Every structure is written in structure tokens, then in C-alpha cells.
């Protein structure tokens, strides 16, 4: 390892991991903060468990970039829209709404489950709150910051 400081124009990789048991109503959930220097936002993987069985997707993704304070540079219309699932991630099958997973190179919904497949108990069902996994990589649409 070189103990000398790096030049200011060298790119750094920043990654953050967060977990919050319950989100607070009316308060934004922060995905990334505290990044210094210039670069571009590469993407997000979001794992989400809903504690109710009904619609979970509202809550727009906001990107406060550089000197943004009151209003974000980018503001979406809903969590499902950010991950490419406008009008939900579902289809109708025999009169029932069924979750529809998908994967593309830059965004997707690869995981859905409402069953706990790791635990078996003869006295209880294997159902659990719905769990979802989403990703979006900003390769074709980089979000740059200075």
C-alpha cells in the first residue's frame, strides 16, 4: 500500500447499507448520504417487507444533489416507478392479482415471497409478511454530482 494521499480527481467507491425496522410516516427514508467529492450514483438494491398486504409502492425517490436543500434535483412519482413497475408489478390470473417478477440489465424485481421457506413447523403455516427485492443501476442514466 502506498501511504501517500491520492489526487483529488481520483474516483472513490462509496457504498452504504441501511436497515430500519419501521419507517416513520411523513419522514423520508434515506438511501445514501454524506458522500463528498464528485462522481455519479451507480444504483440501488432495496429489500422491502410490508407489514400489511395492501399497496406499498408510494413514496417517491428523491435525489438531493450538490446544493439542493428544499427541493430535489430529481423527484420520482413512486417507489414502484423508480424500479420500472408503473401500475404495480402484478397481473390478473383467474380474477386474482398475482405478483409478477422481472429482470432486465438495469432494473428489476427479482424477488417476491410471502412464505418463510427456511422454517417448517407442524403447528403453524409458513406464511409471513410479503417480502420484495428490487434493483436499479444508473449506467445508461447516470446521476452525477459535484
List PLM regions with ranges.
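Beta-strand-centric surfaces of beta-sandwich/beta-rich domains
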Residues: 1-146
